[in-house]
Amino acid sequence: NINVLVLDFYEVTFMDSSGIGFVLGRYRIVSSFGGNVEVVNLSQRLYSMMKLAGLEKLVTLKTK
């Protein structure tokens, strides 16, 4: 069983809407199995972008 999928964004310096779509797609898959998604090591800029997109309501967001 999948409990938590951790996406490490440590080396990610740029992301557009396709990145948001990637995270949402993984959320849909993992949540269908009862799991959660964590996005970790986000820069402040990427954290703000994901929060603006409303992802903090679906996944756990953690900054560097």
Segments and roles (model prediction):
Residues 60-64:
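Short acidic-hydrophobic, aromatic-tinged amphipathic segments that line or gate anion-handling sites
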Residues 2-58:
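Amphipathic alpha-helical interaction surfaces in cytosolic regulatory modules
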